[in-house]
């Protein structure tokens, strides 16, 4: 029986919830189902400015989106014998697992943390890299109520000589420099509750700005240094790369929702009508004082229940939106300056997310970011992605596509993820393997129930922990070669 694995990506945003169902088969990523809800369908009590306000409302909204995506993929069609896609479910694990986005509103970060490990036989193995990263995480001194989401290496030295990839190299002292993103454990527990109520199990958690950058940035941009800004409804999330590694991330509580709020307040019109005005007449390229068509817009007046209206010049509408958008770019720019990497953005500024769809936003950004290039980004095809990808080439879907690509190998090399697993790329044959420091397998497999560790995708997880703290972990003795061989033979038979 052919091996297939299903994974679901779920992006939980303030103004939008998206889900993608993807199939992994023979190293190919195929999207087979998608669904999303926008702000008109999501209960306002569910999520506010990236923060979950109600477990019940949030789980209901997420469950509805996931079920819609699964239905499109045929995953709810067990009894439908005429559905040609339902037959593939026989080879899937019965539990639905999801890669879930995590709002930067909940996160903090620690920069430039170092960890050291000594080699045993004068050769760097994955165990030494694991120990060095764990030592760095311990050195960060996080309290027990904190949970590390990402520990992202950006530099290695071996015997005080800088190296790009230390695996397999000869040396005695390995040092790693990492960027840590963490959150409160309570936030993780609440997210787990929501996803369980939504009918899925969390396989991994990825901060939304990181996922967006995976889906949109090129290798050249990451290497040169680039600021990726995911511009959403109520938040903007900034990620800065330098030398192909994440060096800075920041949550900013501004977004396109604030343009709507300004229009509602300054034009004395109800919020839903202000949103319609923004979508229909929004043009950020207009400058105050510039020539514009003599056009006016009739809009309802607040408090009149739609019985009264007034006329507003189009130029006034566009000026209000432009001023708020400029203020947003000023806030983003200040954060870039605070990062210390403003002079290292050879790849420029990349804008994605729903707000990036606004007419004239790239031109407006260029008037503010004058020292480097600006481009608008949609998800790009990577890792042999197939299926319904054409429908997702939209900046609104950068995060959810990035979640799937993270699973397919788009992560940072030697990253320690939210589950305490070291993920790395094998440059020789790009065959994914499960190398474990614990002799107990992290994922069980059988001839009829296999997992992604058998697929030819450029990613290999290393289980580094059983505890939830992800702090120092004592390495356990690995099985020998012949014992591993016997174990594999016994599983076959």
From Swiss-Prot:
SUPFAM superfamilies named in the record: Actin-like ATPase domain
Localisation: Cell inner membrane
CDD domains: ASKHA_NBD_FtsA
GO cellular component: cell division site; cytoplasmic side of plasma membrane
GO biological process, one term: FtsZ-dependent cytokinesis
Claim: Signal is one of the keywords in the record: no
Biased composition (Polar residues): 436-465
Family statement drawn from the similarity comment of this UniProt entry: Belongs to the FtsA/MreB family.
Protein name: Cell division protein FtsA
Species of provenance: Helicobacter pylori (strain J99 / ATCC 700824) (Campylobacter pylori J99)
Gene from which the chain derives: ftsA
């Amino acid at each position: 029986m052919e091996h297939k694995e299903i994974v679901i990506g779920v992006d939980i945003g303030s103004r939008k919830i998206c889900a993608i169902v993807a199939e992994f088969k023979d190293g190919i990523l195929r999207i087979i189902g998608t669904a999303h809800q926008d702000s008109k369908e999501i209960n306002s009590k569910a999520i506010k400015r990236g923060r979950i306000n109600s477990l019940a409302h949030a789980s209901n909204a997420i469950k509805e989106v996931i079920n819609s995506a699964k239905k499109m993929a045929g995953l709810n069609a067990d009894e439908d014998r005429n559905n040609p896609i339902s037959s593939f479910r026989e080879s899937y694990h019965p539990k639905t697992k999801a890669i879930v986005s995590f709002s930067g509103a909940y996160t903090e970060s620690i920069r430039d943390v170092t960890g050291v490990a000594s080699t045993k036989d004068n050769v760097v193995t994955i165990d030494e890299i694991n120990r060095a990263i764990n030592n760095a995480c311990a050195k960060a001194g996080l309290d027990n109520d904190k949970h590390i989401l990402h520990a992202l290496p950006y530099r290695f030295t071996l015997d005080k000589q800088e190296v790009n990839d230390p695996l397999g190299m000869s040396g005695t002292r390995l040092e790693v420099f990492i960027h840590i993103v963490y959150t409160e454990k309570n936030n993780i527990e609440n997210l787990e509750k929501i996803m369980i109520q939504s009918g899925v199990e969390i396989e991994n958690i990825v901060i939304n700005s990181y996922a967006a950058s995976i889906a949109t940035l090129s290798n050249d941009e990451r290497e040169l240094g680039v600021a990726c800004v995911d511009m959403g409804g109520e938040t903007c999330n900034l990620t800065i790369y330098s030398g192909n590694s994440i060096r800075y991330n920041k949550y900013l509580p501004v977004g396109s929702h604030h343009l709507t709020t300004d229009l509602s307040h300054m034009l004395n019109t109800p919020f839903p009508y202000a949103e319609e005005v923004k979508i229909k007449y929004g043009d950020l390229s207009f400058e105050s004082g510039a020539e514009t068509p003599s056009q006016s817009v009739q809009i309802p007046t607040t408090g009149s229940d739609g019985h009264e209206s007034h006329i507003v010049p189009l130029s006034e509408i566009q000026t209000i939106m432009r001023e708020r958008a400029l203020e947003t770019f000023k806030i983003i720019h200040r954060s870039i300056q605070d990062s210390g990497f403003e002079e290292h953005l050879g790849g420029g500024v990349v804008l994605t997310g729903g707000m990036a769809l606004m007419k004239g936003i790239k031109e407006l950004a260029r008037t503010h970011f004058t020292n480097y290039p600006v481009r608008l980004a949609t998800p790009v095809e990577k890792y042999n992605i197939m299926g319904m990808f054409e429908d997702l080439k939209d900046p609104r879907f950068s995060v959810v596509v990035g979640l799937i690509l993270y699973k397919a190998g788009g992560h940072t090399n030697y990253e320690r993820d939210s589950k305490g697993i070291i993920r790395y790329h094998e440059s020789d044959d790009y065959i994914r393997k499960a190398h474990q420091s614990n002799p107990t397998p992290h994922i069980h497999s059988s001839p009829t129930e296999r997992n992604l560790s058998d697929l030819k995708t450029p990613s290999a997880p290393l289980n580094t922990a059983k505890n939830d703290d992800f702090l120092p972990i004592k390495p356990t003795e690995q099985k020998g070669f012949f014992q591993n061989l016997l174990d594999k033979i016994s599983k076959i038979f």
